[in-house]
Amino acid sequence: MNTSMSWIKMYVPDLDVTAQEYTDAMTLSGTKVEGFEKLDADLDKIVIGQIEKIEKHPDADKLIICQVNIGTETVQIVTGAPNVKEGDKVPVVLDGGRVAGGHDGQKTPGGIKIKKGKLRGVESFGMMCSIEELGSTREMYPEAPEYGIYIFTEDAVVGESAIKALGLDDVVIEYEITSNRVDCYGVLGIAREAAATFDKKFVPPVIKETGNDEKASDYVKVTVEDPELCPRYTARVVKNVKIGPSPKWMQRCLASNGIRPINNLAVSYTHLTLPTKRIV
């Protein structure tokens, strides 16, 4: 059973502890924690930058020189990425910062430190990052290109933390839930336990019923053949469903829990199921 700290804090907003403090206290309270992973452990000094100008490298056909606005200044970065253009907003690791690994997705313990240098005689003061260099994968971020730099949407704010914008400023907690604690099989159960452990207020999700005066029975019939095994089974009808991408916040929520976001229907189903561990 895995949950992210950000998801727990959705239901316990006043929870303000470190991952280690959380792990120790939850284990002592009876909800054993096997361990935790900080998604940004090997990431540092990575901001959102916007490419303002691109020029060809004078001595290398496959390299380009980019002038990148990082909010406080404009820095020059040399790259061989084939997918960037002027106006793109990209993750930029600054001089002295760290990335988790290389383009191949292999993580380096402690990360890779980025220093300013020269590429074929032209100075470069940082590096633009692929999603793999940030320690994640295209499975978790399906909008990322197969080869090249990750491109943010137009609403990304230049100068802000790229780590936070991607939801990588999070901690994934791994629990060992025993069979006598079925109440903790879902995120809501874990959140209730955390609220009790740290003496914080538990804020349950607010569920608003939407729809119209139409009845589901006009479209589908539900028959419970064995009420003892299944005392209740209900159905709702959802019409005009269009398959497409799910909202970014929902994608990030699932990705931080190690679940690949597929489309709006699959992601919505999973996001409804995980808190209660009840089949929807």
Language-model region placement:
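Phosphate-interacting basic helix/loop segments used at nucleotide- and nucleic-acid interfaces
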Residues: 29-32, 175, 252-259, 266
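Phosphate-backbone binding interfaces of nucleic-acid-interacting proteins
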Residues: 1-214
